[in-house]
């Protein structure tokens, strides 16, 4: 089973690299404009992992169905790359994760609940950038271990790692080294100092493989990843609320917002559920394309 899921996870990466859409699509940030000169086109960007790419495709297709010209720039990179792109006009719209975005913008943020995070994020966004209505759907960060590791060290919560962290290697994306929702927060809030940190991908096939092969003993995975259940992995309970609510939310350039855009993306957010994300991520892992999965989800919810 683990082998099959690893193959599927590898497919995730291939999909991310080879995805094409029926919409106009450009290379991520290649020849990016210095300002928003074309007010008729909305450029939808994504981070460099499949769920973000899928959500960007859903947004773009939903808007296109309402007669709005769209382009996609998928797999731009991490928040440290695409947030400046949103500010400089290279992109106009991003599917975002509310809590992570808030933490990026406000290093001292303490909001945790969906309502508190949304309120704080509204205030924290830079001038010219706005958030639309958040979805109830969430994809939360987590610290995952194998069942064997959990049983060996009697781990149920992140706090349970403290006596043994010095024996364990932690895996995660490179930006976890400097993010509050990463090594910094694990040390400050939980007192964890791991043996070492191994830079991997963003909860993708490299992370999964490293965890299953015991190259790392704890790793950053996301709650909507179908590989968690398929590989009998354990997400340790975050009893000190290190990871804030991660509701999916459209974040976009204020200059591109109008009634049609707002109503369209609000309808997408209202229809989207956490279960939908798990199911759609599973389909991507089984080689379905972003276009096909997005189109079928929109059709199911009569949004195209």
Question: For each predicted feature, which ranges?
Answer:
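Sec/Tat signal peptide C-region and signal peptidase I cleavage site
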Residues: 20-24
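Bacterial N-terminal signal peptides that target proteins for export
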Residues: 1-10
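An extracytoplasmic/periplasmic, membrane-proximal ligand-sensing/linker region
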Residues: 38-41, 181, 187, 192, ...
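Ligand-binding "clamshell"
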Residues: 105-132, 213-215, 227-240
